[in-house]
Design a protein with these regions (language model features):
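Hydrophobic h-region of N-terminal signal peptides that target proteins for export
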Residues: 8-16
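Extended, histidine- and acidic-residue-enriched regions that form the cofactor-binding/catalytic faces
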Residues: 17-85, 89-97, 103-108, 115-131, ...
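Sec-dependent signal peptide recognition
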Residues: 1-8
Length: 301
C-alpha cells in the first residue's frame, strides 16, 4: 500500500512539473492555439482570416520592442471573440530600417516581407479561406500590405483588404504624437500592462531638421499636403542623408511632443474598443455582401 501511494504521489509530482513561464489560456479562433480539426470546423462557418502584420522595433524606454506586433495580435484576438474569423499571425518583424540605430530592432527587406505575406496567404487560401483581412500595426508596412492585398486579388480566388483602412482616425490632438507617444503607450497599458514601465516615461525633445519642425503645426492640424511631404521625408534610414532616422530625430526613440507620463490604460481601452467595434462592424457588413460558399467549393481538390 505504501509503495502504491508513493508511486501515485511521484506520478502526480511529474504531472505538476510543467513550464512555469506558460500562463497563456487557449484563445478562441487563434490559429497557434488550434488543432487542425478545429480549423476545419471553423471553415464550415467562416472563410475569413485576419493576418496581423507589424514590427519588432524600438518603442522608447517605456514600452516594449514588440509593441506593434502585440497590439495587432491582441486586437485581432478581441475581434475574433465577437465575430467568427480566424486570427493567423505569420511573422513578427517588419520594415523598420530607420529604427536600426536602437538595439533590438529587426528589419526585413521589402522583397522578403511581401513574399512571406503572399505565400502565407496562399496557404490559407489553399485550405479554403477566401477573405483575407490584413491588420497592419506598423506604418512602415502600409505600402507592402496594399501591394500584397492587390496581388491576392489579381492572382488568386480570394479577396484581400486592409482591415484598418476603413477605421483609422485616432483622436486628433493639438500636439504631435506618433511613434511610442501617448496614444501607443496608452494602448500598451491596456493590452499588455505588465510590459509597460511608466517610470521611464517623460517629456521627449524632438530634433527634426528645421524645415520639418516648421511644418509640424500644419501636420498636427491635418493639412494633407504638409502631412504627405512630411512623412515622405521623415523616418528614413540614416544612410539616406536626410537626417531623419529615429535616432537623429529623437534620443529616446519616442516621436512625440507630448509627455508620455500622460498615458493611461483608460485612453488605451477607449481607442481599442473603438477599433475593435469598427472592425467587427466591417466584417459583419462584408458577410451580408458576400454569402459564404460551401466548403467543398473552397478547398483544394
Amino acid at each position: 500500500m505504501i509503495f502504491r501511494i508513493a508511486c501515485f504521489l511521484f506520478g502526480a509530482t511529474l504531472l505538476a512539473q510543467t513550464n512555469p513561464l506558460w500562463h497563456e489560456q487557449k484563445i478562441k479562433n487563434y490559429l497557434p492555439h488550434m488543432t487542425w480539426p478545429e480549423v476545419q470546423e471553423l471553415l464550415t462557418r467562416s472563410d475569413m482570416v485576419i493576418i496581423p502584420v507589424a514590427s519588432i522595433e524600438e518603442h522608447g524606454p517605456q514600452t516594449p520592442i514588440g509593441t506593434d506586433y502585440l497590439s495587432g495580435v491582441e486586437r485581432a484576438k478581441l475581434i475574433a471573440q465577437k465575430t467568427d474569423v480566424l486570427v493567423a499571425p505569420i511573422i513578427l518583424p517588419g520594415l523598420s530600417p530607420y529604427h536600426m540605430e536602437f538595439p533590438g530592432t529587426i528589419t526585413i527587406s521589402h522583397d522578403t516581407l511581401q513574399r512571406v505575406y503572399f505565400e502565407s496567404a496562399q496557404s490559407l487560401i489553399h485550405h479554403g479561406f477566401r477573405r483575407i483581412l490584413f491588420l497592419n500595426s506598423h506604418a512602415g508596412n502600409q505600402f507592402l500590405t496594399s501591394y500584397v492585398a492587390d496581388r491576392i486579388n489579381q492572382e488568386t480566388a480570394a479577396i484581400a483588404v486592409e482591415l484598418g483602412a476603413s477605421m483609422r482616425g485616432a483622436a486628433r490632438t493639438s500636439t504631435f504624437d506618433r511613434h511610442a507617444g501617448v496614444a501607443e503607450t496608452s494602448g500598451a497599458m491596456y493590452l499588455f500592462p505588465n510590459l509597460v514601465d511608466l517610470s521611464k516615461a517623460g517629456k521627449n525633445d524632438l530634433t527634426l531638421p528645421e524645415h520639418l519642425n516648421k511644418a509640424l503645426p500644419q501636420v498636427v492640424a491635418g493639412d494633407a499636403v504638409a502631412t504627405q511631404v512630411f512623412l515622405a521625408e521623415a523616418l528614413k534610414p540614416k544612410e539616406t542623408g536626410k537626417h531623419t532616422s529615429t535616432r537623429e530625430m529623437s534620443a529616446t526613440g519616442v516621436w512625440s511632443e507630448r509627455d508620455t507620463r500622460e498615458s493611461t490604460a483608460e485612453q488605451g481601452r477607449a481607442a481599442t474598443e473603438s477599433f475593435v467595434n469598427a472592425a467587427v462592424a466591417f466584417i459583419e457588413k462584408w458577410k451580408t455582401l458576400r454569402p459564404l460558399a460551401p466548403l467543398a467549393d473552397r478547398q483544394a481538390k
